[in-house]
Design a protein with these regions (language model features):
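Charged, terminal alpha-helix-loop-beta segments
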Residues: 1-125
């Protein structure tokens, strides 16, 4: 995650879920013989976290992926796949969000067809 994207992920967690706890660079899928590791820019949990703790089955979470550019197919794919990867861990994904610097209305309409997937535009303070 770049320094811009870190700032964007933290902004989203702080403004939308101030009572949640952001776990940055969350490992949703470790590297294996036939797959690469998959990191989420952020996972927001609502129980006090331990340092890089594992998610608890049944726990409600919000998954965050950030890109310092306009909403596009790459970020949309990350939002959808991130939701599915984290759900495989047995948690309840309330929302999977892509944070971007500019909205693309056509792409956002496509993203909204997928349950629990949304995009928001980063507003620097």
């Amino acid at each position: 995650m770049s320094k811009h994207e870190t700032k964007m992920t933290r902004w989203y967690a702080k403004t939308r879920y101030p009572k949640g706890f952001l776990m940055e660079e969350y490992l949703a899928l470790p590297r294996g013989k036939t797959n690469g590791k998959r990191l989420m820019d952020g996972v927001i949990v609502f129980r006090k976290p331990f340092v890089k703790r594992k998610l608890i089955k049944g726990e409600r979470v919000v998954v965050v992926q950030s890109k310092h550019r306009r909403l596009g197919m790459g970020l949309i794919g990350q939002v959808i796949v991130s939701r599915d990867l984290v759900e495989r861990l047995g948690v309840k994904v309330m929302k999977s969000v892509g944070v971007c610097t500019e909205m693309d209305t056509v792409m956002h309409r496509m993203l909204r067809k997928h349950p629990k997937c949304r995009a928001v535009v980063y507003r620097a303070a």
